[in-house]
């Protein structure tokens, strides 16, 4: 069952994506369109339709647009081509929707409405649907069908005047995107004027490679004036068009002045157009334009990922530059902590040493000799002693000087640890600020062209929205772990040393008090063999060092410094995380590189064709 499902999936995939085409121009275009529509390209629905339309366009008529300023005579020109007055003429803007002139055996009109409906009606109804003064159902486009041989291979597109109104202008520009060539119609009075040239430049990319500039109303000029105007107009306009001619629609209406009108030159130009070449150039131009749009998208994504890579590069550089000083500060702190522990030990040992006193003591010993049997001799001596309770009370309760000093040292140490933690946080805050700025800038990014990939942009938005999850979470976990290790070490230091000084003092006092008492017992047993124990200051100091665990902390601070280890581990782990993030971003860029290679392959193939 599962094998059958898998085989069905593979077969469906091959039917969709493993299609082969012949070696004709159309077949090669189909192959290139398929490459742009590969699954990993994530083509938008609009792009898929555009690619299909490009292939279909090779079997359709070429579209030649009639473009010109309002009242330049476009309707009159098209009426001459149609052989009858179909399009209304006059001073009122009437051609408010694009109008297509197509071939049919009879004259009729098809009106396509904005709601998707359409009607077919008599050609005489055209004026009703084109007059802006009429309140009619919103039309999307008008299609005039006429039995004109020229229209068998060519569809003429009448566009609204460029300066009729803002909406007409926008519509005109939109319609120009789907034409193979254009007739730029201009009044001969405007020939060579800057305003006219500016309008041409604004639409230059949309004119195609087979366009003609037609100057209307040549009947207004004398032969000499016409030559001068043509020479000047050609010097200005011919760089934009294949050909430039002057006609007179007025003269072309009259059979007797038709030849003089030069209208036939325009018809000859249209008739002699190589429609196959036009279609091929059009498709090539459109595919190159699509490649440019997709490449722009690709470069945008590369730039976004490069920004993250640069941020991590800058962050790592900052870490390395700052960490040398940071480690030096920690090394200094290690020695400071050790010196503070020794200072506390020195202070306690001095107080204990000062509390060692002497007192009068005596003991009895059985007298020797026959006559002294059962008699005892008293021996007086000076005995060392420590009143542990009195000494302890004197140090910590009768006076709070030492307690205040130790508390001050502890607070200073706490601040030092907090400063270390703050510096670690500052490192992460630098990265966090950059990542959050990145998220804010790109989390709602939208495509700026309909042919760009919806899926790619959707995934990019999701990626940017989750950038803190992708790029901050691990660093924050590392920070949390490092701070926890610092807190644990501080707590250990605090419990075993800085809050243990009273207990260490008690233990030290008890130790020396016991040793003194033991020495007295031995001394009283045999004063010739044993001596009284008077603790030296160095002995007391060593004992306090042990009770305060100073030697243990000396190992943890100097020989195998825990703080330095935590700091170095933070740096090493940060660098490892940066490498991981860079690899992750490189994988993202590898996907983009694969798409870019596909785009470049299509671009090079279309240029070679």
Swiss-Prot record:
Q: What organism does this protein naturally occur in?
A: Campylobacter jejuni subsp. jejuni serotype O:23/36 (strain 81-176)
For this protein, what reaction is catalysed?
GTP + H2O = GDP + phosphate + H(+)
Renumbered residue ranges of the record's region G1 motif: 68-75
Which residue intervals make up region (G2 motif)?
93-95
PANTHER family, per the entry: SARCALUMENIN, TRANSMEMBRANE GTPASE FZO
Q: Which UniProt keywords apply?
A: Cytoplasm, Hydrolase
Q: Which residues form a coiled coil?
A: none
CDD domains given in the database record: DLP_2
Name recorded for this polypeptide: Dynamin-like protein 2
Q: What is the effect of changing residue 74 to A?
A: No GTPase activity
- GO molecular function terms here? hydrolase activity
Subcellular location as annotated: Cytoplasm, Cytosol
Amino-acid positions noted as binding GDP in the UniProt annotation, renumbered to this chain: 72-76
Give the CC-aspect GO terms.
cytosol
The region called G4 motif is annotated at 216-219
Looking at the keywords, is Cytoplasm present?
A: yes
Annotated region described as Inserts into assembly domain of DLP1, required for tetramerization, given as residue ranges: 1-16
Assembly and interaction partners? Forms a 2:2 heterotetramer with DLP1. DLP2 forms a central back-to-back dimer flanked on each side by a DLP1 subunit. In the crystal structures the 2 DLP1 subunits are in very different conformations.
- Disrupted gene: resulting phenotype? Double dlp1-dlp2 deletions have no obvious cell division defects, have no flagella (possibly due to loss of expression of flgP) and are non-motile.
Region annotation Linker: where it falls in the sequence: 17-25
Segments of this protein annotated with the region G3 motif: 158-161
Q: Please classify the protein's predominant subcellular localization into one broad category.
A: cytoplasm
Membership in a protein family:
Belongs to the TRAFAC class dynamin-like GTPase superfamily. Dynamin/Fzo/YdjA family.
Summarizing the function annotation, the protein's role is: The heterotetrameric DLP1(2)-DLP2(2) complex tethers liposomes and may mediate their fusion. Initial binding is probably mediated by DLP1, while DLP2 couples DLP1 subunits and increases the effective reach of the complex up to 45 nm. The role of the nucleotide is unknown. This subunit alone very weakly binds to liposomes; GTP, GDP, GMPPCP and GMPPNP do not change heterotetramer binding. Tetramerization is required for GTPase activity, suggesting the GTPase domains (dynamin-type G) from DLP1 and DLP2 must dimerize to reconstitute the GTPase active site.
């Amino acid at each position: 069952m599962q094998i059958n499902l898998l085989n069905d999936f593979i077969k469906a995939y091959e039917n969709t994506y493993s299609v082969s085409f012949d070696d004709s121009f159309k077949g090669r275009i189909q192959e290139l369109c398929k490459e742009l529509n590969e699954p990993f390209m994530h083509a938008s629905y609009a792009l898929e339709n555009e690619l299909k339309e490009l292939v279909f366009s090779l079997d359709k008529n070429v579209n030649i647009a009639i473009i010109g300023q309002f009242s330049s005579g476009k309707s009159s020109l098209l009426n001459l081509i149609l052989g009858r007055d179909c399009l209304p003429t006059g001073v009122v803007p009437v051609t408010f929707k694009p109008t297509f002139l197509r071939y049919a055996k009879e004259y009729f009109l098809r009106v396509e409405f904005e709601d998707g409906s359409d009607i077919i009606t008599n050609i005489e109804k055209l004026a009703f649907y084109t007059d802006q003064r009429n309140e009619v159902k919103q039309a999307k486009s008008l299609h005039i069908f006429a039995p004109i041989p020229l229209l068998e291979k060519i569809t003429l597109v009448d566009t609204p005047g460029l300066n009729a109104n803002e909406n007409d202008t926008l519509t005109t520009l939109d319609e120009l995107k789907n034409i193979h060539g254009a007739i730029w119609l201009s009044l001969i009075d405007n020939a060579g004027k800057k305003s006219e040239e500016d309008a041409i430049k604004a639409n230059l990319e949309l004119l195609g490679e087979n366009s003609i500039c037609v100057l209307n109303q040549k009947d207004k000029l004398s032969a000499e004036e016409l030559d001068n105007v043509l020479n000047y107009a050609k010097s200005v306009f011919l760089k934009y068009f294949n050909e430039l001619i002057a006609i007179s629609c007025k003269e072309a209406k009259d059979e007797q002045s038709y030849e003089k009108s030069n209208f036939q030159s325009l018809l000859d130009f249209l008739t002699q157009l190589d429609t196959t070449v036009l279609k091929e150039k059009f498709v090539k131009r459109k595919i190159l334009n699509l490649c440019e749009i997709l490449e722009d998208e690709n470069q945008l994504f590369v730039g976004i990922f490069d920004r993250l890579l640069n941020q991590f590069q800058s962050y790592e550089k900052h870490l390395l530059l700052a960490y040398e000083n940071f480690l030096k500060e920690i090394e200094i702190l290690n020695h400071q902590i050790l010196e503070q522990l020794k200072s506390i030990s020195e202070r306690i040992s001095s107080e204990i040493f000062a509390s060692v006193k002497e007192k009068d003591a005596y003991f009895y010993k059985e007298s020797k000799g026959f006559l002294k049997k059962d008699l005892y001799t008293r021996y007086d001596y000076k005995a060392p002693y420590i009143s542990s309770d009195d000494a302890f009370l004197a140090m910590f309760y009768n006076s709070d000087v030492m307690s205040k000093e130790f508390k001050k040292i502890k607070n200073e140490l706490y601040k030092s640890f907090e400063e270390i933690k703050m510096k670690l946080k500052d490192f992460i805050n630098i990265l966090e600020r950059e990542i959050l700025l990145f998220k804010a800038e790109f989390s709602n990014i939208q495509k700026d062209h309909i042919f760009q990939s919806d899926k790619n942009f959707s995934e990019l938005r999701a990626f940017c929205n989750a950038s803190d999850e992708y790029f901050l979470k691990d660093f924050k976990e590392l920070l949390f772990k490092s701070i926890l290790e610092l807190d644990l070490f501080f707590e250990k230091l605090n419990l075993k040393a800085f809050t243990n000084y009273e207990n260490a003092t008690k233990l030290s006092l008890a130790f020396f008090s016991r040793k003194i008492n033991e020495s007295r017992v031995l001394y009283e047993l045999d004063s010739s063999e044993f001596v009284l124990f008077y603790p030296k200051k160095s002995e007391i100091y060593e004992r306090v060092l042990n009770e305060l665990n100073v030697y243990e902390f000396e190992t943890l601070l100097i020989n195998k410094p825990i703080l330095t280890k935590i700091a170095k581990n933070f740096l090493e782990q940060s660098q490892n995380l940066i490498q991981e993030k860079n690899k992750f971003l490189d994988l993202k860029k590898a996907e983009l590189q694969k798409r870019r290679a596909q785009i470049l392959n299509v671009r090079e193939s279309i240029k070679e064709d």
